[in-house]
Amino acid sequence: MLQAEMIVFVGVILWMCVFSQEPSSKVMADRYAVFWNRTNPRFQRGDYHIDVCINDYLDVYCPHYEDSVPEERTERYVLYMVNYDGYSTCDHTAKGFKRWECNRPHSPNGPLKFSEKFQLFTPFSLGFEFRPGREYYYISSMITETGRRSCLKLKVFVRPPNGCEKTIGVHDRVFVDDKVDNALEPRDDTSHEAEPSRSDVSTSGLRHQTSRPLLALLLLCISLYLLL
């Protein structure tokens, strides 16, 4: 009788361990890619905005060019985080501060990528903390070859918690890759890296799916050994 109860107990533990790894039961982070250049049609309309949740990521990709493109034809930007007035007038001097700098248009490792994590608290002195229900603004400006000032701006709204219930089963962009592929060292909680390849995402999902059967097999072997 004791052996039968042990088998039932081990079976319940095994079931809980396996199904607790199901993707549908996990709340994950989304990533939002923004290609920061004048040819992006979403910037041309002047109303580029995204809605995010706490712990989501914003990935800003800088302009990147082949070596054959001369320096004077490349785009370079300094991105600022500003208040609403700075966003409306595209002026970073009023309560704004520099966030990132796109200054390597010929980077050998591909386009520079700057990642912002929308988190409530940060352990870094140069990090930034975000609050649900508020808007945040990013801008950059440059003088074009025609002498006109080009202003690119982005509005980010952090949704309240009741609007952020999501699971991996209904969201596509959920793989968070903290690997730094480029040669820049982050000074805060901003990561600097080259554009990830599609293989990084697909292999990550494959490893996640294959780990569950292996875990089940391992637990089954342990339980059988204990019953002998």
Curated annotation (Swiss-Prot):
Tissue: Widespread expression in the embryo.
GO cellular component, one term: external side of plasma membrane
Biased amino acid composition, Basic and acidic residues: 184-198
Ephrin RBD domain ranges (all copies): 29-162
One BP annotation, GO: mesoderm migration involved in gastrulation
Cysteine pairings via disulfide bonds: C62-C102, C90-C151
Positions of the pro-segment in this chain: 205-228
Topology term for the membrane: Lipid-anchor; GPI-anchor
Gene3D superfamilies, alphabetized: Cupredoxins - blue copper proteins (2.60.40.420)
The keyword Signal appears for this protein: yes
Keyword set includes Cell membrane: yes
Residues making up the signal peptide according to the UniProt record: 1-20
Keywords per UniProt: Cell membrane, Developmental protein, Differentiation, Disulfide bond, Glycoprotein, GPI-anchor, Lipoprotein, Membrane, Neurogenesis, Signal
InterPro entries linked: Cupredoxin (IPR008972), Ephrin (IPR031328), Ephrin-A_Ecto (IPR034252), Ephrin_CS (IPR019765), Ephrin_RBD (IPR001799)
Glycosylation sites: N37
GPI-anchor amidated serine-type lipidated residues: S204
Top-level taxon in the UniProt lineage: Eukaryota
UniProt GO MF annotations: ephrin receptor binding
PANTHER family recorded: EPHRIN, EPHRIN-A5
Function: Cell surface GPI-bound ligand for Eph receptors, a family of receptor tyrosine kinases which are crucial for migration, repulsion and adhesion during neuronal, vascular and epithelial development. Binds promiscuously Eph receptors residing on adjacent cells, leading to contact-dependent bidirectional signaling into neighboring cells. Induces compartmentalized signaling within a caveolae-like membrane microdomain when bound to the extracellular domain of its cognate receptor. This signaling event requires the activity of the Fyn tyrosine kinase.
Protein known as: Ephrin-A5b
Organism from which the protein derives: Danio rerio
Phylogenetic classification of the source organism: Eukaryota, Metazoa, Chordata, Craniata, Vertebrata
Gene symbol of the encoding locus: efna5b
